[in-house]
UniProtKB/Swiss-Prot annotation:
Protein name: Putative pre-16S rRNA nuclease
Cellular component annotations (GO), alphabetically ordered: cytosol
Keyword field: Cytoplasm, Hydrolase, Nuclease, Ribosome biogenesis
Organism: Syntrophus aciditrophicus (strain SB)
Transmembrane domains' residue ranges: none
HAMAP family linked to this entry: Nuclease_YqgF (MF_00651)
Length: 150
């Protein structure tokens, strides 16, 4: 089963894709946000191209585990995306993935000016890999919810 991972942001959406066995996530692309129609069109094209059956979208819980205003935006986007594409969209905790992605790029010697486009797709791959690891260890928590819940 191919799964697409998304790191949703106001200006960009990082995109990652898992391998056909569902074991590893790879950074794929960064969508520069222009409009809902543009965003969903690009994501729909990726879903068709890679025969994606599910999307995992980062859910930005606060460090204390509570939901903030950005969570509401992700829920709205995920619900609209699920309705438009007709495949499940699962929210998955993304706490500190962007910070981790920035640290990885820094340690790899990527100059700060070149990180902007890469950090989002790398964060998406970290979110998706976390989800894949939980599946493989059968540790999907009961509170992992899809876009229709909450």
């Amino acid at each position: 089963m191919r799964i697409l991972g998304l790191d949703y942001g106001e200006k960009r959406i990082g995109v990652a894709l898992c391998d056909e066995l569902g074991l590893t996530a790879q950074a794929l692309t960064t969508v520069i946000r222009k409009s809902w129609r543009n965003d969903v069109g690009i994501i729909a094209s990726l879903v068709r191209t890679y025969d994606v059956e599910k999307i995992v979208i980062g859910y930005p819980l606060r460090l204390d585990g509570t939901e903030g205003i950005q969570c509401e935006k992700v829920v709205r986007f995920a619900r609209r995306l699920e309705a438009a594409l007709g495949i499940p969209v699962i929210r998955w905790d993304e706490t500190l993935t962007t910070k981790e992605a920035e640290e990885i790029l820094s340690r790899s010697g990527v100059p700060p000016r070149k990180r902007r486009g890469v950090v989002d797709r790398l964060a998406a791959s970290l979110i998706l890999q976390s989800y894949l690891d939980a599946i493989s260890q059968e540790k999907i928590p009961s509170d992992a919810c899809d876009a229709n819940e909450s």
